[in-house]
Curated annotation (Swiss-Prot):
Name the UniProt record assigns to this protein: Zinc-finger homeodomain protein 7
Zn finger residue spans: ZF-HD dimerization-type: 163-211
Record gene name: ZHD7
Molecular functions (GO terms): DNA-binding transcription factor activity; transcription cis-regulatory region binding; zinc ion binding
Localization per Swiss-Prot or TrEMBL: Nucleus
Main location (coarse class): nucleus
């Protein structure tokens, strides 16, 4: 295909060629230590062979054909080099000290504008050592994006999602809710759809709860430790198949609490008869355990369970231990409560302490028991079942006999006294 060029376009091209020759002479004088004949011989056939394929291959090969790059920069990919001089319609294939070869692409009058627009970027990447090293580093990190623009685009377009615990219900057909317990998504080795399966539970990544990872510098300052740990462990997904952030921002579920299997609960200690003595120390109702029953009491298994102190409600996961009393303790406490009027008064403090020491319960437990068993105040304690109450005032004299015996006793008192006097006289 032939293109018609006007005279003013040819004049502009000649001026550009002269300017380029002067610039390249200066560059070659400043960086002649990087130019080698072997590199030039290797790059010229590449340009000549790629010129017949397509304009894109022309641009790729032309970016490599400049003899100003050091030999150790062969890691730069063609796509990165092409991005350093994107869309240029006026490309130089190779230049020697005495000859120059020029490749022209169809562009017409826009050649001068594109040449002027992309000249700083081309000189910045290919002119000096620092620019070449920066371009190679960015091209390797950005995955072929090339140049500063490619690196920034890869970092800006990468989705910042973090996939946490698996929410797949494995018992949905049965009408139940069963989770597998997977705490975080781990990508499987491989490419494509195989990488979207969790290596821990085998479920697809869409079953895992998704949350935004690091969205702003403010969040980095709030939690730098967690962000660095996540980046080190590779928990942030950077796959190209992920949905952009703005597309699903309205579909995020406001999960305020973790799933039931992720919530931390206090350990539940099983309460058994063997561990009952150990649980007495944690009881909120008493300080002293009732003494063990002797084997002579056959009704020891019929001990009633009474309510304990309700000062502070215990936790829902821990069963509160209730104080157990024997039948003898209940009868003695009932008899004592009848004597004091089912209330503990301050004047009776000494008697209450003495009774608690005898029965084997604390004052607090006795007070709670009297409060919970006020309904027993209507029925007095039975005299047959209760033991004899301890006498409050000890009287050494025996009880007086009945009246008729007392009269008979007075009637026979003088003979007894007389007999005692006779015995003393005989002695």
């Amino acid at each position: 295909m032939e293109y018609k060029r006007s005279s003013h376009v040819e004049e502009e091209e000649e001026e550009e060629e002269e300017e380029d020759d002067e610039e390249e002479d200066e560059e070659e004088q400043g960086h002649h230590q990087y130019t080698t004949a072997a590199a030039q011989q290797q790059l010229h056939p590449q340009v000549l062979g790629s010129s017949a394929s397509s304009p894109s291959s022309l641009m790729d090969s032309a970016a490599f054909s400049r003899p100003l790059l050091p030999p150790n920069l062969s890691l730069v990919s063609p796509s990165a080099a092409a991005a350093a001089a994107p869309g240029g319609s006026y490309l130089h294939a190779a230049h020697h000290h005495g000859q120059g070869r020029r490749v022209e692409a169809p562009g017409g009058e826009s050649q001068h504008h594109l040449q002027r627009h992309h000249e700083p970027a081309r000189n910045g990447v290919l002119g000096g050592v620092a620019g070449a090293h920066a371009a190679s580093t960015l091209a390797l990190v950005g995955g072929g994006g090339g140049g500063p623009r490619g690196g920034e685009g890869a970092a800006g377009e990468a989705p910042t999602w973090r996939y946490r615990e698996c929410l797949k219900n494995h018992a949905a057909r049965m009408g139940a809710h069963v989770l597998d317990g997977c705490g975080e998504f781990m990508s499987s080795p491989g490419d494509g759809a195989a990488a979207l399966a969790c290596a821990a539970c085998g479920c697809h990544r869409s079953f895992h709860r998704r949350e935004p990872a690091v969205v702003a510098p403010a969040s980095l300052s709030l939690c730098p430790a967690s962000a660095s740990a996540s980046a080190a462990a590779g928990l942030v997904s950077l796959s190209p198949s992920a949905t952009p952030t703005g597309a699903n921002s309205s579909r995020l579920m406001p999960l305020l609490l973790a799933p039931p299997h992720m919530q931390k609960r206090p350990p539940v200690l099983p309460v058994s008869p063997a561990s009952a003595p150990a649980a007495l120390a944690e009881s909120s109702s008493e300080e002293l355990r009732p003494p063990p029953l002797p084997s002579s009491h056959p009704h020891a298994h019929a001990a009633a369970v009474v309510a304990a102190s309700a000062s502070a409600p215990p936790g829902p996961s821990k069963k509160r231990f209730r104080t157990k009393f024997t039948a003898e303790q209940k009868e003695r406490m009932r008899e004592f409560a009848h004597r004091v009027g089912w209330r503990i008064h301050k004047p009776d403090a000494a008697a209450v302490d003495a009774f608690c020491a005898q029965v084997g319960v604390s004052r607090r437990v006795l007070k709670v028991w009297m409060h919970n068993n006020k309904h027993l105040a209507k029925t007095p304690p039975s005299p047959t079942s209760q033991p004899p109450p301890p006498p409050l005032h000890h009287d050494p004299s025996p009880p007086p006999p009945p009246h008729h015996h007392h009269h008979h006793h007075h009637h026979h008192h003088p003979p007894q006294h007389h007999q005692q006097q006779q015995q003393q006289h005989d002695a």
